[in-house]
């Protein structure tokens, strides 16, 4: 009984200290997304939130803050908080009651492995280009809810751990930042190798027969990799996901995160 109570207390404590995000796409026609984040149990007098200036696998500075506007911050009661800035990519927020909510508009129109793209065909998200973070809270778990457009038949594909519906989780900021996401009316194929799932998510306008042909080639490459190395890696949650977007509106790029692969081309 004591162990159960201790476990329950620990679970509630972790939940209270989870940073949560939501993102919605009502104005996708103008390449805009609305991002909201909540940072609970903040102990410091101020909290610095910022946009990243780098991205996994990209050895250059990218000023992602240039695509953010309409920033505002409130406390747990919904009251506005004082915000100061001392550089182009950070916001310093005064803490009044331990809860800090932020909201901003993201402009996104470069689909690839570095930036993000939002339009009426999809939301193609590179996490560092999309979500603010608090460096002092980087070890906290994260929950993210993608408000996918039902009127456009959007679904969510990502390497993040699925919780329920369109809500996913990451154990910390590092994992979150390395988890690109494709939200669209995509198609998918999958097969099992040694008890693990290899999934291919494809967002493109081509017929199913072309996807079937492509998928057989992908499977052959995966199996050949296993033959060369003797085994496949142990993937998180038993799954590896290819996230492919082949469309005239993307920029053309690729990137290899931890348990997924971004592929874009025109």
Role assignments for model-derived ranges:
Residues 1-21:
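Bacterial Sec-dependent N-terminal signal peptides
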Residues 17-27, 37-38:
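Non-catalytic, glycine-rich low-complexity segments
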Residues 25-26, 57-120, 134-136:
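A surface-exposed beta-strand-loop module
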Residues 33-65, 132-134, 138-149, 156:
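Surface-exposed beta-strand/loop patches in extracellular or lumenal glycoproteins
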Residues 34, 68, 88, 99, ...:
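Extracellular structured ligand-interaction cores
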Residues 64-67, 107, 139-157, 169-175, ...:
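Zn2+-dependent metallopeptidase catalytic core
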Residues 103-186:
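Extended, low-hydrophobicity, Ser/Thr/Pro/Gly-biased non-transmembrane segments
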Residues 187-266:
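Juxtacatalytic substrate-recognition/specificity segment
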């Amino acid at each position: 009984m004591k162990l159960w109570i201790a476990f329950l207390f620990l679970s509630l404590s972790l939940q209270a200290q989870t940073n949560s995000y939501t993102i919605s796409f009502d104005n996708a026609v103008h390449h805009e997304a609305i991002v909201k984040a909540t940072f609970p149990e903040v102990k410091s007098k101020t909290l610095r939130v910022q946009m990243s200036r780098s991205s996994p696998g990209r050895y250059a500075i990218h000023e992602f803050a240039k695509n953010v506007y309409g920033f505002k911050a409130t406390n747990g009661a919904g009251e506005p908080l004082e915000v100061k800035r001392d550089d182009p990519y950070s916001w310093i927020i005064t803490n009044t009651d331990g809860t800090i909510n932020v909201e901003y508009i993201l402009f996104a129109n470069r689909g690839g492995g570095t930036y993000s793209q939002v339009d009426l065909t999809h939301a193609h998200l590179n996490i560092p280009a999309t979500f603010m973070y608090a460096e002092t809270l980087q070890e906290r778990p994260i929950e993210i809810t993608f408000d996918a457009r039902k009127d456009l038949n959007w679904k969510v594909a990502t390497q993040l751990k699925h919780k329920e519906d369109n809500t996913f989780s990451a154990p910390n900021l590092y994992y979150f930042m390395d988890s690109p996401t494709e939200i669209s009316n995509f198609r998918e194929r999958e097969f099992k190798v040694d008890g693990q799932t290899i999934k291919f998510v494809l967002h493109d306008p081509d017929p199913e027969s072309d996807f079937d042909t492509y998928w057989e080639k992908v499977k052959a490459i995966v199996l050949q990799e296993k033959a060369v190395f003797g085994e496949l890696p142990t993937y998180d949650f038993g799954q590896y996901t290819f996230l492919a977007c082949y469309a005239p509106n993307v920029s053309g790029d690729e990137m290899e995160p931890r348990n997924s692969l971004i592929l874009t081309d025109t």
